[in-house]
């Protein structure tokens, strides 16, 4: 909490480093978008596969889209959080930790550059810029993958039937809630990664130890936020009662 407060106080200073914010945003997109989008497409394919073979036995293959619609706001944010924790969170610990033990952070302070603003706050702002783009495209690819497989590969349902069921069990409000949940996970993951990287000590061994700690804590954060958000946003849905 103390570290988070320091980050918030340093955010106004980060406005002086717009180019660094954009650079970090570009790095996040280039290095993380492919794996995030690929796994969300896999999730969409899995939803269509399970939906087809399970519901076909019950004579309800027309409702295959239920699996994708619920997956968008239930499994989707968790998958996003786990990937972000492994790819981005651990990367931040390694990057900032190596800078700490090689005294690069101390050198920034000596030069009069606020290390928290330049190294941490800029990354927080970058993740705020990048996450909506990654999430919207990821959820779109998840829907598109399931849509194509269900209609043209498994022949479970027609295009109109698929879209009708999908939007019956998922509204724009559900989508925005899923994005908000994912962004909350992302901010928490980046803060944890920056904390363990910024405070690393003990040489390369210490950096490795902090990387492992950050991954464990981020997995807990994703699980806790996921459970709370499911009950808060979707637990009372009469059309798709989850958690009741």
Model regions and ranges:
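Membrane-interfacial helix-loop-helix connectors in multipass membrane proteins
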Residues: 50-73, 137, 141-183, 192-210, ...
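Short, membrane-interfacial amphipathic segments enriched in basic
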Residues: 1-19, 196-201
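Active-site cofactor/substrate anionic-group-binding motifs, chiefly glycine-
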Residues: 24-79, 83
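A hydrophobic alpha-helix feature that marks transmembrane segments and, especially
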Residues: 82-100
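Selective transmembrane-helix segments that form parts of the transport pathway or gating/packing helices
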Residues: 29, 33, 37, 84-88, ...
């Amino acid at each position: 909490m103390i570290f988070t407060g320091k980050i918030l106080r340093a955010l106004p200073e980060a406005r002086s480093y717009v180019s660094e914010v954009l650079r970090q945003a570009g790095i996040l997109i280039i290095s993380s978008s492919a794996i995030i989008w690929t796994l969300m497409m896999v999730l969409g394919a899995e939803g269509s596969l399970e939906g087809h073979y399970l519901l076909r036995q019950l004579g309800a293959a027309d409702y295959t889209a239920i699996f994708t619609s619920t997956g968008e706001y239930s499994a989707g944010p968790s998958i996003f959080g786990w990937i972000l924790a492994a790819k981005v969170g651990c990367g931040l610990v390694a990057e900032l930790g190596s800078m700490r033990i090689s005294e690069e952070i101390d050198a920034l302070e000596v030069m009069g550059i606020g290390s928290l603003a330049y190294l941490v706050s800029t990354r927080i702002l970058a993740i705020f810029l990048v996450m909506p783009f990654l999430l919207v495209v990821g959820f779109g690819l998840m829907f598109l993958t399931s849509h194509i497989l269900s209609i043209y590969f498994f022949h479970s349902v027609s295009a109109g039937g698929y879209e009708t069921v999908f939007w019956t069990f998922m509204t724009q409000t559900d989508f925005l809630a899923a994005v908000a949940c994912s962004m909350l996970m992302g901010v928490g993951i980046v803060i944890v990664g920056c904390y363990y990287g910024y405070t690393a000590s003990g040489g390369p061994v210490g950096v490795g130890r902090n990387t492992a700690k950050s991954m464990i804590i981020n997995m807990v954060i994703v699980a806790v936020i996921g459970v709370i958000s499911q009950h808060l946003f979707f637990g009372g849905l009469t059309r798709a009662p989850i958690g009741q």
